[in-house]
């Protein structure tokens, strides 16, 4: 039922954006459809590329999470900090929390993050736990290729948004990685369909 509620919205958005692209060679600039948000954290730009593609395809609004103490552009330079935060389930500060009233208007929130030490970036958890997300639809996406890491990262997002509704609804151990991720890489971050053959548009159709 949860997926069915999202199908018309995503497919309508995809169709509308595709129609616009046939008459205008310039990139679309979404104005936002009012009830969907793409919320993401990105260090190297991989997650950002996918987040921006989702916005282009759906017309959602977008917000990039910034850490109060910025991470290095290359996460390997911050590996000790990242590992410490992940293994100890810490909550680093967020520099740009949204007003609670501003977030409350969204019914559907895409949540994007790299997988760091089998977890989403902990700053994403800090952000999510700052709000009442009861009954909102949360759709996680990640940039990393290992299915084990993706399952563990999904479990963390589900845990910190336990009162929300989730797509996918369940998380079996053998979950197909393509159902929850469109991994980005430095050499394909600017490609129309990053990460795999079906790309972001195919992923949206699968989850929708």
Describe the role of every protein-language-model region.
Residues 1-5, 21:
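Positively charged n-region of N-terminal signal peptides that target proteins for export
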């Amino acid at each position: 039922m949860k997926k069915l509620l999202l199908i018309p919205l995503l497919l309508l958005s995809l169709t509308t954006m595709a129609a616009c692209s046939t008459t205008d060679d310039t990139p679309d600039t979404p104005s936002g459809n009012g009830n969907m948000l793409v919320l993401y954290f990105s260090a190297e730009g991989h997650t950002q590329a996918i987040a921006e593609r989702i916005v282009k395809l759906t017309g959602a609004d977008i917000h990039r999470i910034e850490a109060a103490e910025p991470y290095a552009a290359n996460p390997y330079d911050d590996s000790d900090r990242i590992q410490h935060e992940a293994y100890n389930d810490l909550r680093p500060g967020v520099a740009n929390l949204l007003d609670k009233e501003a977030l409350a208007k969204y019914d559907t929130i895409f949540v994007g993050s790299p997988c760091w030490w089998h977890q989403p970036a902990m700053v994403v958890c800090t952000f999510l736990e700052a709000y009442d997300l009861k009954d909102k639809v949360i759709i996680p996406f990640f940039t990393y290729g290992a299915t084990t890491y993706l399952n563990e990262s999904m479990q963390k997002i589900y845990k910190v948004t336990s009162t929300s509704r989730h797509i996918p609804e369940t998380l079996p151990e053998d979950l197909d990685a393509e159902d929850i991720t469109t991994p980005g890489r430095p050499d394909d971050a600017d490609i129309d369909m990053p990460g795999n053959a079906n790309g972001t548009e195919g992923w949206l159709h699968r989850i929708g």
